[in-house]
Each structure stands twice: as C-alpha cells, then as structure tokens.
Amino acid sequence: MSLEEFSYWLIVYNHAIVTALINAVTALSIYFSLRAGIFNLSAVGFMAIGAYTAGILSTRFGLPSVVGITAGIALALVLGAVLVYPVLKLRGHYLAIATLSFAAIVQAMAMNLDSLTNGPSGLLGVPATVRAWHVVIVLAVLLYIACTLQKSRTGRAWDAIRTDVSAARAMGIDVEAYRLKAFLISTAVAALAGGLWAHVNRVVVPFEFGFVQLTMALVNTLLGGISTPFGPVLGALVVTSMPDWLAGFAEYREMIIGALLVVIVVYLPNGLIDPLVLLGRRIGLSRGAAAGGTR
C-alpha cells in the first residue's frame, strides 16, 4: 500500500477508527470495575454526564474542549462519590440493578430537561476538536496506568477481592477502599470517553447512552477478556470493525457477527486476549530455556 493509498484509507475510515478507539476507552472503564469484582452497569450514565457537560460548556459558553471534558470528569466523580457508598454495600445482581438504574435515570433526565439538554433533539454543533491522534494518546496513557495498577499492590488486591471477598478481608485487604478506587477510576474513564465522543460526533443525543450501548460496551470488554488491560481494547477494536469487514455480506452481516460472538464466547471463555497471553508466555519460556542452554 502506497502512502497516498494509506492517506486515502485514513480519510475514508477516520470516523470509524476514532469510534473504535473511543469504544476501547469505554471498555477500559468497565474493565476497571470488573477487575475489582464490581458488576457496574453505570458506565453509559457517566458517559452521558461527560458528553453533555463537554457539549454544553463548548456550545453555550464557548469554553475549550479540554476544559469541558475535564469538567465532565469532575462532575462524574462527584456524582460517583455520592452513588458509590450505597451501591457498594450491595452484591451481585442487586448491585447491577442499582447501577443500571442510575444510568437509566441519567438518560431520562437527558430526555426531559429540555432547557439544559435540548431534550430528544440533543445538543447540536459541538465543535469537532478531537482528532484520532488525541484519542490514541489518551488510550495509550490509560493502558499505561492500567498496566501499572495491574502489577501494583492495588492490582493484586483487586484480583483477591474479585476471587473471594471473604478471603481478601482475612488477608487484611481493605475491601471497601479498593472497591471505591476501582469504581471512581471507572467513573472518570467513562466520563472521559463521553467527553471525547461529544467532540468527535458533534452531536450529543440521549439515545446514544442507552441499554444497547451498554450491552455493546460489555460485549467489547468481556469478549476481549479482562486478564490484561489490552483485552477490552482488543475486543472493542474487533467488534467495532466487524461491520466494515463484512460490508460485502450486508444481508447476513448481523447473523455472521452473532455467530462469531457465540463461537468466541464458547471456545474462548477468557476472551480473545487469552490465547495471545498464553502465546507470549510460551515464547518467553522458550527464549528463557534457549538462553539457559547456551550458558
């Protein structure tokens, strides 16, 4: 592929690429909760908060996108701090229902607060100031943070809590503090994804933050796997790009995508990233054995 062909390809698929990258950021927000054993379904609600805050501050007050996105993250963290204490006292499906209810309330408010959100019509004319390379940098920073946390005491505590809460407490782990950290990080990342999306899509409407979007975000995360932070990113990139891969099979596209997802879930229960992780370990072991044999 020549440089001109590559440039043309980037122009044609720019929006699809940016969408896939933002979906990867959203998947990472869910990843942080799941790592601590929190089945948190509020991600789209905090995405909406981030998107509407960024959109309102840019369209009505003319503030720079960085300010709007930062304000959206700050507001989401405040609301997340209010929500987290009653929610984290719940377990299992009760926690899932509570966080899903929060997301539904946020969407309902976006639909009905016409004077603030412009109701079902949404916010129009949000400045398109976010570029693909901006999102790449954001995603790279988030992956670095996630990988650092995974190898730290926090990551080990999350793994222990996810595996067995009672055993984690017996080991002296402050379960509530670590779950709080995971929830708030997840909240901030979701709001960041929403703010980025507002400045890419140029329109913020309530239906973009509903149950369908939540389901797709969960699919992206679980399909990729949560054994490493790269799993959700891989899942998001694969799922988001599937419709483009199957453009020549428009009539059967949804059926093919559904069948592929079922096959992956059945045969790769730990996600798409799992065989890649195992392959990396085998390569590392073989190199170590080869190095040992040459001594």
Role assignments for model-derived ranges:
Residues 1-295:
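Transmembrane alpha-helices and adjacent helix-loop boundaries
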